[in-house]
Amino acid sequence: MNLKSKDLLGLRDISAEEIEYILNTAKTMKCIVTSNNKKTAHLQGKSIITLFYENSTRTRLSFELASKYMGASAANISASSSSVQKGETLIDTGKTIDSMGSDIIIMRHPMSGAPHLLAKNVKSSVINAGDGMNEHPTQALLDMFTILEKKGTLKGLKVAIIGDILHSRVARSNIWGLTKMGAEVNVAGPATLIPPEIEKIGVNVFSTVQEAMLDADVVMGLRIQLERQKKGLFPTIREYSRFFGVDDKRLKLAKEDAIVLHPGPVNRGVELSSSVTDGEQSFIDEQVTNGVAVRMALLYLLTRRGIVNEVTD
């Protein structure tokens, strides 16, 4: 099997079969990540560029480690220190990187659709590392991989996503991916943080966290997106925590063996209490490990796809 596109721009337009293919490949990569010898030569001779127009710690470092573990040459470009500051356009930046022989460009941008624009104008494969409020596909893939590891399947599971759904690209990618894989998705948050007509993409919307979490197999907290919000969407952080924060008492509404996830960074005492964040049902640290494995899988599959096309075309 091969990925159909040269790019990974989102989970909205990817098939369930492709998602399964990526997750199965990530299982092999997880063995490398957790071994004493993390070096392989799968991507030797390949050039991976991270192009980030927004700050990032987890995602950027995860991709850089994934590249190095696979034997690729990796370079990071920050918008603050690039020719963007001199007025260079996104397309011109992409073409410059392309001309230097890059194989994959990993891009984060504050504007929704920016990775799609880049992908149309470069020969390199483009991976969306988060675009505005649109999608964050690799985060959703690592979330699904973590669930699959702990539950053995995605089909038929009830997943409760709690928090700022409106501004969350993580929520959107998870909704697209989880529903395609047969999971039932519940969402809850302040009415001002729930997108209008979100039910049309296959989720159940609840006004209370208690309803959304009842008998859930997975509870996913979302970070309050303060940097993306206009004022007045909810009274105070304290009020948000009171009505929508997940603590030990509320977690008991979920199934006894429910797992807790969060894309990070966690605002302790807001989305999740410290006891839930550090508790036995929390697999937040495992998500970080799995992020490297999933991104290794993507780098491998996208570069492999190019090699296959060169041979067969």
Curated annotation (Swiss-Prot):
Binding site for carbamoyl phosphate: 58-59, 108, 136, 139, 264-265
The keyword Transferase belongs to this UniProt entry's keyword annotation: yes
Catalytic reaction equation(s): carbamoyl phosphate + L-aspartate = N-carbamoyl-L-aspartate + phosphate + H(+)
Enzyme Commission number, as recorded: 2.1.3.2
List of residues binding L-aspartate: 86, 169, 223
Single GO molecular function: amino acid binding
Keywords (A to Z) from UniProt: Pyrimidine biosynthesis, Transferase
Entries under InterPro entries matching the protein: Asp/Orn_carbamoyltranf_P-bd (IPR006132), Asp/Orn_carbamoylTrfase (IPR006130), Asp/Orn_carbamoylTrfase_sf (IPR036901), Asp_carbamoyltransf (IPR002082), Asp_carbamoyltransf_Asp/Orn-bd (IPR006131)
Residues in coiled coil: none
Quaternary organization: Heterododecamer (2C3:3R2) of six catalytic PyrB chains organized as two trimers (C3), and six regulatory PyrI chains organized as three dimers (R2).
PANTHER family associated with the record: ASPARTATE CARBAMOYLTRANSFERASE, ORNITHINE CARBAMOYLTRANSFERASE, MITOCHONDRIAL
Official protein name in the record: Aspartate carbamoyltransferase catalytic subunit
